[in-house]
Amino acid sequence: MDSLAVKSRYYVVYDGAWVIQCDGENSEPYERRSDAFRDAVALAHLDTRNGREADVIVQSKDDLFHPAWDSTRDSYPPPLVPEL
C-alpha cells in the first residue's frame, strides 16, 4: 500500500444508542453494540475491497476506545464483537 494513503477508521460509539462514525458522518442508531460492530466491519471490508486499508475502533463499557478489527490482520467476516 502507498505510504501516503489514508486508512479508513470506523468508530462504534454510544451516544444514547450505538452508532457508526466515519469521516464525520453518523449511521442510523443501533440498539446493540454487536450489530453496529458487524456493520462497521462490513463497511470497512468494502474499503478493503476497493484497495484502502480500514479498521474498526469500538467504545467499551468504560468509555475508552479499543481497536477491534483491522483489515491488515483480521479475517472477514469477523467473530462476534469482542468483550472490552
Predicted regions and their residues:
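Acidic, aromatic-enriched beta-alpha/helix-loop junctions
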Residues: 33-51
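Secondary-structure boundary/capping motif
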Residues: 19, 39, 66-70
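A short, exposed loop/beta-hairpin motif centered on an aromatic-Gly-Thr core
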Residues: 23-35
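Short, solvent-exposed secondary-structure boundary motifs
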Residues: 1-7, 35, 47
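Short, mixed-charge low-complexity intrinsically disordered segments
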Residues: 49-84
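Short aromatic-glycine-(Arg/Gly/Cys) micro-motifs in beta-strand/loop hairpins
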Residues: 2-26
